[in-house]
Amino acid sequence: MRLLSLPWLLAAGGARALTEPDRIRLRWAGGLRDPQDPLPGRIDEAVAGDDLAQAESLLAEMPAQDPRKPSLEAAVLLLAGEVTLAEQAARGATTGRARARRVIRRARSWRKELGSTPPGGRAAPGERTPVRAPRDDQPLRVLHVVKTSLPHVQAGYTLRTQAIVSAQLTQGIDAQVVTRLGFPVAQGALAARCEVVDDVRYHRLLSARGADVDRYGSRLADLAQRLNVDVLHAATDHVNGHAALIAARRLGLPFVYEVRGFLEDSWASRHGGDARAASTERYRAARERETEVMLAADAVITLSEMMADDLVSRGVARDRVWLVPNGVAEDYLDPVRDARRMKRLMGLEPERLWVGSVTSIHHLEGLPTLVEAVRLARAGGLDVGAVIVGDGPARAEVLRLLPDDGTVRCIGRVAPGQALDWYDALDAVVVPRIDSRVTRLVTPLKPVEALARARLVIASDLPALREATGGHARFVEPDDAAALAIELAMVDDHRDLGTAGRAWVERERRWRHVCTTYSAAYAATARL
């Protein structure tokens, strides 16, 4: 592990200047690997890499009587979401006390975060906050409360925020954004208190202290009061929602909560799978906190019909749920450029069939299936290559799978404008998501962008992907590389789906159109 120089580290704010994976590895694995007995260090590294299966497998190799095992078991239990059991195990550890103390601190932090409830106690369905009358003499002023943002994080979540606020500005809404307390300094970046990205104002709540929810809510209320906002609009997760709710109730403002995903289910898919993780303390608490914020909101926005159904199953009244699906900016509907010319421009062989994904690289995306499908298709005689454009926590895993011949390439993170170039260079865009509760419910942004560029989309056959594409795609069973390889051989037979998909996006998925729903939702909160 390469460490940064101390002067640079101190100048950038100590450990906050490191990326999150770097900080975790320094915290969990630094100095713990014993070359004579590497097993404890390997367990620490598995925990640092968020690899529960590997951590549990290695832990099982340790003798029960090994005095080092309790602290390691505590770390693995914490990773598995069993917060109380982890803390108990850590307190019983007689060796590895530094590791045990880290577990206890982290368990306390999680318990504080997951134990928080909206001010005034848990909201009952239908309970509302009295709000002040809206101002009639000037444009509606909305403050969006988000977890992360451009330019520091580029993902579907941050691109959606940028697109929504840009559209609202053109519609006469005075919309601004504030990011979570401590962002982006806690992620290792230095930032001003306000940054502007293409006319969108991002306020930063910088803090040298931890992101306590009550402190977050108080700082948020101060900013909202200073900006004289009319509506507080928070987006996933419950920490944002809880803080915005504190501020809204303090100021008498309407509170809108936008459910962009189910983060507890995303976590579950990485930590033992849906069935096992759903019974853990962390999952249950996170789901309860999310539900409480949904029930307390004056209006709830979400992305898809399946997600709306899930909200209703939690007790949210259907007439308070508003759908704002993912859309595309107008430049995605510019004329499509010649694919052969774009292949040359992007360094790809123009005669070869090129497919790929433009995505954040998470395990949910199922990219190993794409790599294997290309291998199978090439073994069957198809001259096909794949490009993976993006970055993320699963990138190292994907890189290990890439062949040495350059037929599958991982490009890394690119600017949004370059993402459009890559779409135009591909013959088909593949969305090989795994089958899990979260992928069945949550609709991603990237397939809509691909259709806007008239690209054939080949996607896992999941309800969320059928809705996200309007059915204008080819569908294969998740995790079935052989079936995907067969679809790759038939790309030329189905290019018309991309053309039809572009027409559908033009009609129904422009940001400037889908974002008009927000005005109706805001107006509804003012009438409560």
PLM regions and their residue ranges:
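A short helix/loop element that forms part of the nucleotide-sugar donor recognition site in Leloir-type
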Residues: G126-P130, D334-L348
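A short, well-ordered alpha-helix in the C-terminal region of glycosyltransferases
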Residues: R495-E508
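Nucleotide-activated donor-binding/catalytic signature segment of Leloir-type glycosyltransferases, i.e.
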Residues: R395-L420
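Nucleotide-sugar-dependent
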Residues: E365, A415-D421, V431-P447, A459-E467
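Carbohydrate-associated surface elements
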Residues: L181, M306, G327
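N-terminal subdomain of nucleotide-sugar transferases
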Residues: M1-D37, A107-R201
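Conserved acidic donor-binding segment of nucleotide-sugar-dependent glycosyltransferases
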Residues: A473-A481, A489-R495
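Conserved donor-binding/catalytic core segment of Leloir-type glycosyltransferases
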Residues: V142-H144, R337, E349-R375
